[in-house]
C-alpha cells in the first residue's frame, strides 16, 4: 500500500520533460511512480487538480549561512518548496577566521557589540559545525562553500595589492582544509572586499586546487554591469587554464548600457561550453539584486575597507569629488535613485530603512548622486539594498535557456519577528 497518492496534478518532474497532468505515488518518503493515472491502494489520497506537483527545489545561490545556524526552521525557503541551498556564496562564509579575527569577535561579544548573525563565525568549518548541537534540527539541506573573501581577509587583509607567494600557499592550505572538512567548493566575490583586489595568478592557483579536489567554483564576477562581457571573458579564460567547473552566480546585465544583450551574453557562455569548458550559471527569477551601496564605489576607495571609504567621503576632498562625478554619470535622475531600495541598516540608521534613494533625495533636498554619498556616510556603508538594475526581458529570456539554474540570493529567514532585529 502507498503512503500517499496525489491525483490529477500538473507534474513537472525536473528533467526538462514537458509537464503533464497525472498522478504521483509516494512510499516511505520517496516518489515511486509518476504516471497519467495510477490505480493503487493508498493510506491517503489527495486530489491536487489545478496544482503543480514537482520535486523540492535546489536554490543554487543562497546566503542562509548564519541564518541557518541561528534558526534551523528555514521557513522563508521551505514554504517556497526549497529543500537544498548552496551557501557560502559571493566569497563570503562564516569561516575561516584567523586567531586575531576570532579574538576580535570574542572581544566584541563581551562588549555587547556583536549582532546575532556575527556571532556565527569560526576558525574552521569543523568548528562552525560544533556551534549546532545534535538536538538542533534542520529543515533544509545545506551545501557549504568556503568563501575566498573570507580566506583573503584573514591572510592578506583589506589592502589593495596582489597576494604574496607565501600568502597564496597559506590560502591554499586553508582551502584544502575546508574541502577535507566537508565543503563542496569555493566561492569568489570579485565585486566585494577583499576579493576585488585578487589578481589572475592568485585566482588561478586556488581554482586549480578546486579542480584537483573535483570541487565547484562559484563566481560573483568583477562586473555585472557595463563591463559584464569582459568579466565573463576572465572566467572563461580561468576555466580554460584550470579545467575546473566554474559556475557564474546570478548572471545578469545590471546596467542600462547592456540591457537587451542577454542573447549575446549567453552565446558567449554557450561557445565556451561547446569548446569543452565546464561553465554553468544561475539567474534570478526577478529583475532586482541585493547588495549594498558601497558595492558601487570604485576599488581604490575601498583600499583598507569601508571605514576608509567613509573617511574619504567625509573629507570632501578630491576623492569625494571623483566618486560624486562617477555617481553623476551613472545615476543622474530621480528614477535612478528609486531603483535603490534600502531594506535595512542593522540599526545604524533607521531613518533610511524601507526607503529608496529617490525618496531620501526628496526628503533631504539633494540630487540623487549627492544623496547616495550622504546615505553611505550616515549608514557607515552598512546598508543592505534591493537594486532594480535589470531589464525584465533579459531576465525572462535567460530563464528559458538550457543550462541555466535559478538562485534566490536570499536567506532562509524565520517568520519569528524577534529574529529580525534592526529591520
Question: What is each stretch, according to the model?
Answer:
Residues 2-56:
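Histidine-rich, glycine-flanked metal-binding segment
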Residues 9, 29, 50, 61, ...:
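Divalent metal-coordination and catalytic microenvironments
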Residues 40, 45-115:
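Metal-associated gating/positioning segment near the N- to mid-region
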Residues 65-68, 92-95, 191-195, 223-229, ...:
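Active-site environment of divalent metal-dependent phosphoester hydrolases
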Residues 85-87, 187, 218-219, 247-249:
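Short hydrophobic alpha-helical runs that function as membrane-insertion/retention elements
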Residues 118-127:
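Core domains of carbohydrate- and sulfate-ester-processing enzymes
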Residues 128-133, 138-165, 172-192, 237-240, ...:
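Active-site neighborhoods of metal-dependent hydrolases
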Residues 177-235:
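Divalent metal-binding pocket/active-site signature
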